[in-house]
Amino acid sequence: MNIEPKYYDNFLEEHIAQLIDMELREVSWQYDYDSVKNGVNKHWHVFIGHDEGEIEDFGYHISMVWNQIKNKFPEYKLERAYLNAHTHGLEPHIHRDDGDVTFIYYPRMDWKPQWGGGTSVFDENYNVTLHAGYKGNRIINFEAHSLHQAQPVSRECYQLRTCIV
């Protein structure tokens, strides 16, 4: 499988994106998640599920992200879904995911570009092959085994940088 890392803006209809943004503001986040086994940098995390039923049970509007992925990319199957988040001062590790393809959806519609918090994808020599700034209603995708990292959030930002993976 050879997938070029890409991002897509306006992934969902505007009103659905707004509902997802509001739904995620009500989530009870859990801190202390490792993206790298025994890593020192932790972040906020909530597991959603391993199948479509579990995703829908978690939140109807969040399931619409998977439904749109399925419509646009029918060749992929859901392995699991979860929420990640971090704030200023938390710097996630460069890491790889398991599975075939990773999709990351940015739900915060009020996010300002100067706050940072995007995602960078790297080649094996740690050169950036894609940097996608954080923008509400944007989704990025890349091969799951690709090195990638959520980017730091500016100290001027007092918001939680959230994403659906």
Where are these regions (language model features)?
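Catalytic core of non-heme Fe(II) oxygenases with the double-stranded beta-helix
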Residues: 59-165
